[in-house]
Amino acid sequence: MKKVITFRQLFYMFLAISITPILTLIPADLAVGNSSSAGISVILSLVALIPLALLIVVFMKAYPHYNFYEILVELFGRAVAKVLIAFYGIWSFVVLSTKVWQYTLNLQSSIMSNTREQVFFVTMMILVLYAFLRGIKTIFRFAEFVLVPMLIILFIYILSAIPNIRLDYIKVANTLTFSELCGQAGYIIAAAGNLFLILIYGDSVKDHSKSGKLIARFLIATIALFLVLLILVTVVTFSLVGNNASAMISTPFYVAMKGISVLNILEHFEAILIIIMFLSDFLGICLYASISMRCIKWACSVRKMKFLYIPFAVFIYYLALVLCRTQFDVEYLYNTILVKWNLIMQYVIPFALIIVHYSKIGVTSTRMQRVEVKSKQ
């Protein structure tokens, strides 16, 4: 595999695809409580995010230039690795179909309410197919190119909203139990779990020789920026429209920004948010389409994948229509099934893998010690 991706591009991609969930799904899910409970949930999410970051560092250092499938082969052998990859492939199909729906609903609920979902599906698939023909390197470079402008615009939105903040909306004591707070933290953890997916591209990273300090630095900065942006967006959203209203809106931050002006000069510029969410959705769909194709490649031992692009696009089109029919179906699928499934695929299985990794190291070191003892005898 050609080394075409840098660590910076990997982490930029994670932040870019996280923007839409930060603006839509997570504030709506955290709105069950209030700003105080949301802050506590963010802190609780670190209990999972910090170990996940350490896990990524361990795997990157222990298996340099290995992708996720090759790591599984090293730990379990080829047969078990193919079964696990098939499981990851099914999961990525469902996530991809859900992301296509979420992108569609974001546009329908904001500026194109009378447009049929099939139009959005086909439009996105054409764009993704074009991106795939340009190559995965181009997709990651595009994420690197658009992330900084997206973040600058979001911070301008947040600063512009400060004069309109209602403190009585956010100065509320937490009323949720610890188990409910953990449930809210689960939504944050499920979105942040995309960090684990960088292991999928371990064989494509250019600068693996610098992995130790470089990965740690990028991980700390990425997680910190993710959480800071999440806190700011959630607090601003709750302080403008209230947590009760946020819970009932699919795009709460977009609604909160309506009527906000910059220096009393620029007004009604919330439409730029639609472009930002579209770019984030586009990159997220590209990423999960790439992961799905890689899982097919590894599970079926296929070398060339271009002939599968159009059949796979048609498959995802119909899978999305079969899985969901309405916004209620999408929300039910995500909140009831997909969040828990994400936690299993991005946390439970990886942490099980790290246990197997260290147990194999322990067995190997024990055998080496026995060999040394016998040789001395």
How would you name each of these model-derived features?
Residues F93-L96, V100, F132, P149-N174, ...:
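Hydrophobic alpha-helical segments and their helix-loop junctions in multi-pass secondary transporters
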Residues V32, Q108, M125-V146, S204-H208, ...:
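Membrane-water interface regions at transmembrane-helix termini and the short interhelical loops
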Residues L23-A28, V32-E117:
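Membrane helical hairpin/interfacial module
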Residues L44-L55, G89-K99, L127-V128, V148-I162, ...:
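Selective recognition of specific alpha-helical transmembrane segments in multi-pass small-molecule
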Residues D29-V57, N335-F351, I361, S365-V371:
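Extracellular loop-to-transmembrane helix junctions
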